[in-house]
UniProtKB/Swiss-Prot annotation:
PANTHER family: HEAT SHOCK PROTEIN 70KDA
Predominant localisation class: cytoplasm
SUPFAM superfamilies listed in its UniProt record: Actin-like ATPase domain, Heat shock protein 70kD (HSP70), peptide-binding domain
GO molecular function term, any single one: ATP binding
UniProt-recorded name of the protein: Heat shock protein homolog ECU03_0520
The organism's taxonomic lineage, starting at the top: Eukaryota, Fungi, Fungi incertae sedis, Microsporidia, Unikaryonidae
Subcellular location: Cytoplasm
Length: 683
């Protein structure tokens, strides 16, 4: 390849896998994806940040090596903190195992706050890591730590590419919540990337993109249709996605995400923690005079490093020794660990991964009511869905192993047992697959380096219905669970009160029929509507979900052209994974009741419209006697008063509504006959 051709086939946009324990950067260079080594010559970088005696930032292996000298200044697991609140139970539990000090912090006012955990707090990003050196205290937000890791990787890429890099695709877990996604984008901005040139990509989707690209690279004329499951088990998160791939040779390829599942607090760190706890327990048994509180943080960090090493050794060996000299004073820690013991310790977590995998299969078949046991270790499967689950499982062509923890032999064995050993593959280095796919995506979006003949398009999906509140508190969905993104949907609504000059647009997320059972994620007003009878104004509402999953809702009055909108991004009200599971369970349990409620409110609305139409007729009619007019207004007022006390489904019985509606229909029919109209006015 000529130098000129190589330059034209090189992109200055990069792909970054910002991992919990390790991160990786890749670029599209001279027509192919290349993993870029860091300043230490490593293909992956520990997601660790520390500070030296002069308070200078140290990143990666050098930071991790400072554990022995200054353990309290070595920060890891930032990915588990970003976008979360201090009171999050997962954060509170994790704090117990972190050697560094994590505090509640008001970043706006720059002050530490009491660490007392409060019920029902919704204040995101109120976490700081507190580092004290030489009598001086500094506070670092998790986003700053992630930003420092991203900057380190950005510098490595610029050294390889020979110039400034300001565009990137940064990967996030598929089940990251909106605050976590937004804070990740903020970290990229801190690292010096152009905020308008940063795209987020789900980690399993990036890995699938790597697989798709490799398939087309192997054979430019490759044509096939495959159902591919991506099993992505990293250091701190677990994602599983099912995609439909269609390879069309020189015409390019298409991958559509059909379903996702996962756990943003499940990964290799959790396996490490179980090993650590086991070793401490064994050590204390042998040294009964020592208490756990006597153990120093530096010793615990050395134990963590040793457990991480031995965990990797057990992927190829059947036993190993966990040895930490002078673990406490002159006492060494020396624990023999077999692969069988390790698998027994972690069995419930391995099973949890498999149950999530089955849940993903069910979601891909259009089953929204996927429910798990309280600890997440068991899929609560309706027996009637067993056949569906097996059908989807049997249609899987490949299971892609992604993430360092997917190398664990027991994980491979469970997947092989369930899907068939011949289907379980590792097409790219498991530690590099996500960065590989992100780099290809970055080159495709931000440059012309990728040849059209090798193009690959991947389309993601939304996890829950996105709705607005309509009359009676009904959730009217514009975008449905499973719809592929990006997506834009528009529907026309109207007012339901006479002379209404403003409307409030309430936006909800969830699969229930009534808004009160879903999650409110935004609200805004549209003012300046010209006063008119209800039903006359036309309000056009548009839902627009972009590639990053960011929702923009726009409302426009068609008569005046006035509009307003809301961007639903870093909202503290977006759903967590636990809330999604709770709501899908409730949706299944209450499906019949929801349908009955929706029908009930529909009947109420029809009755309300009938009264409104008849009232307008009576007020304008010239051929109706004063007696009939007076009687009509009395009946109208009586029913309007009843409706004013029947705003919610629980305020009235449907039988009473039907009786009143039938009586009103008979009354209006008689009136219309008297004036020679032959029937009730149209609602």
């Amino acid at each position: 390849m000529s130098e000129e051709k190589a330059k034209s086939n090189t992109s200055r946009a990069i792909g970054i896998d910002l991992g919990t324990t390790f991160s990786c950067v890749a670029g599209y260079i001279s027509g192919k994806v290349e993993v870029i080594t860091n300043q230490d010559g490593e293909r992956t970088t520990p997601s660790v940040v520390s500070f030296d005696e002069n308070n200078c930032t140290v990143v990666g292996t050098a930071a991790r090596n400072m554990v022995g000298s200054d353990p309290m200044s070595v920060i890891f697991d930032a990915k588990r903190m970003i976008g979360r609140e201090f009171d999050d139970p997962k954060i509170q539990n994790a704090i117990k195992g972190w050697p560094f000090k994590v505090v509640r912090y008001n970043h706006r006012e720059k002050r530490e706050e009491p660490n007392k955990v409060s019920e029902g707090s919704n204040s995101y990003d109120n976490i700081a890591i507190k580092i004290t050196r030489n009598g001086k205290t500094n506070y670092y937000a998790p986003v700053e730590i992630s930003g420092k890791v991203l900057l380190y990787l950005k510098n490595a890429a610029e050294a390889r590419l020979g110039g400034t890099v300001d565009s990137a695709v940064v990967t996030v877990p598929a089940y990251f919540e909106e605050p976590q996604k937004d804070v990740t984008k903020a970290a990229a901005t801190i690292a010096g990337f152009d905020p308008n040139k940063v795209r987020l990509l789900a980690e399993p989707t990036a890995a699938a993109m790597a697989y798709g690209h490799i398939q087309t690279q192997k054979n430019a004329n490759f044509s096939a249709k495959e159902d591919v499951l991506v099993f992505d088990l990293g250091g701190g998160t677990f994602d599983v996605s099912l995609l439909d791939f269609e390879f069309n040779g020189a015409a390019g390829s298409l991958g559509i995400v059909k379903a996702i599942d996962g756990d943003t607090f499940l990964g290799g760190q959790d396996f490490d923690n179980l090993l650590i706890n086991y070793c401490i327990s064994e050590f204390l048994k042998k040294n009964s005079s020592i208490k756990q509180s006597d153990l120093k943080e530096s010793a615990l960090l050395r134990l963590r490093a040793e457990c991480t090493r031995v965990k990797a050794v057990l992927s190829s060996a059947t036993s190993s020794a966990i040895y930490v000299p002078c673990f406490h004073m002159t006492d060494d820690l020396n624990v023999q660990i077999t692969r069988a013991r390790f698998e027994l310790l972690c069995d419930h977590l391995f099973r949890r991964c498999m149950e999530r995998t089955k849940g993903c299969l069910l979601r891909s078949a259009g089953v929204p009511e996927v429910e798990y046991s309280a600890d997440g270790s068991k899929l609560l499967l309706n027996p009637s869905l067993e056949k569906t689950l097996n059908e989807v499982k049997n249609n899987i062509s490949k299971v892609l192993l992604v993430g360092g923890s997917s190398r664990i032999p027991k994980i491979k064995a469970l997947l092989a047992e369930y899907f068939g050993a011949h289907k379980v593959i590792e097409p790219v280095n498991a530690d590099e697959a996500v960065a590989y796919g992100a780099a290809y995506q970055a080159a495709s979006i931000y440059s012309d380096a990728v040849d059209a003949g090798s193009s690959l398009l991947l389309i993601d999906c939304v996890p829950l219905n996105l709705s607005i509140e309509t009359a009676g508190g009904v959730a009217t969905a514009l975008i449905h669970c499973g719809d592929n993104i990006p997506i834009k949907k528009t529907e026309t609504f109207t007012t339901y009160e006479d002379n209404q000059t403003a409307v409030t647009i309430n936006v909800y997320e969830g699969n229930r029929a009534m808004c009160k059972d879903n999650k409110k994620i935004g609200s805004f007003n549209l003012d300046g509507i010209i006063a008119a009878p209800r039903g006359v104004p036309k309000i056009e509402v548009t839902f627009d979900v972009d590639h990053n999953g960011i929702l923009i809702v726009t409302a426009q009055d068609k008569q005046t052209g006035k509009e307003n909108q809301i961007k639903v991004t870093n909202s503290q009200n977006r759903l967590s994974q636990e809330e999604i599971e709770r709501m899908t369970k409730e949706a299944r349990d209450n499906e019949q009741r929801d349908n009955e409620t929706k029908e009930k409110m529909g009947k109420r609305m029809a009755f309300d419209q009938a009264i409104s139409s008849f009232k307008a007729f009576v007020e304008k009619a010239n051929n109706i006697s004063e007696e009939k007019k007076s009687e009509s207004l009395r009946v109208i007022k009586e029913n309007e008063e009843w409706l004013s006390n029947a705003q919610r489904p629980e305020d009235f019985e449907v039988e009473e509504l039907e009786r009143r509606s039938n009586d009103f229909q008979s009354f209006t029919s008689d009136i219309m006959k008297d004036v020679g109209m032959g029937g009730a006015p149209a609602a």
